[in-house]
Amino acid sequence: MKELVVVAIGGNSIIKDNASQSIEHQAEAVKAVADTVLEMLASDYDIVLTHGNGPQVGLDLRRAEIAHKREGLPLTPLANCVADTQGGIGYLIQQALNNRLARHGEKKAVTVVTQVEVDKNDPGFAHPTKPIGAFFSDSQRDELQKANPDWCFVEDAGRGYRRVVASPEPKRIVEAPAIKALIQQGFVVIGAGGGGIPVVRTDAGDYQSVDAVIDKDLSTALLAREIHADILVITTGVEKVCIHFGKPQQQALDRVDIATMTRYMQEGHFPPGSMLPKIIASLTFLEQGGKEVIITTPECLPAALRGETGTHIIKT
């Protein structure tokens, strides 16, 4: 039986900077992702892809707000912006994959618009933490804050300021059974894009969307557990996770067990909003039945699956 691998692709891997926001730039970036997936398929894995949408959903939301203010067009709720980016990014990945798969194999890629259930009383709704959209300078942030007093901003990794929105914890992947069925039919599945569309249960038992952006690494780990994946791969901007990052004693991690990684986390080696959610997602996946987590760059992913690079987190 093939091993099932769930791979999380960062939204910043598709929009790398403010100069690369066009659909044309994103489509080119996605082609590199498709080439990597093709190499993984050659190694005989079943694959599910998830992706971030931080830059994209912020752009969509800002576009809707400007259109509303200038032209009186209806506002698009944040949850719908998440759904829009799921479809848009999923389409780009799906098309790039299917163009390659048609030449090299029999598998097909398909995108599943995915809802993720959250708790309506999650404290994340009261304390926005998820950065979205473009980076702003000090003066741009001040101008936006003046025009939108209810917005919150954070300084993001020395690159400028970004707007932050609510980010509740994912509780259940609504479409997990459908994703699992598609895997069994031989599809490469793209799902839970942007962390999934956040929904809550009403008193009547219906699903209702809420305005938030769920952390895609936490949703990916939850999806991996619900479909019984063997390996979780989280791609990021560094080849290996490091402790003492950016300091003279910086040390890259090759193979680490749960206990050691938990200690590093408790010692504060992983900053919130960047590496920390990836580590939390990794440990949760392993503690609830996963075999292995790999953290590396998209480019190094095939080599990491062969054990040649990347940070590998294991149970013991």
Swiss-Prot record:
Keywords: Kinase, Transferase
Highest taxon in the source lineage: Bacteria
Source species: Escherichia coli (strain K12)
Protein name (record): Carbamate kinase-like protein YahI
GO molecular function terms noted in the UniProt entry: carbamate kinase activity
Family: Belongs to the carbamate kinase family.
Gene3D superfamilies attached to this UniProt entry: Acetylglutamate kinase-like
Keyword match Transferase: yes
GO cellular component: cytosol
Entry-linked NCBIfam families: PRK12352.1 (NF009007)
GO biological process: arginine deiminase pathway
Name of the encoding gene: yahI
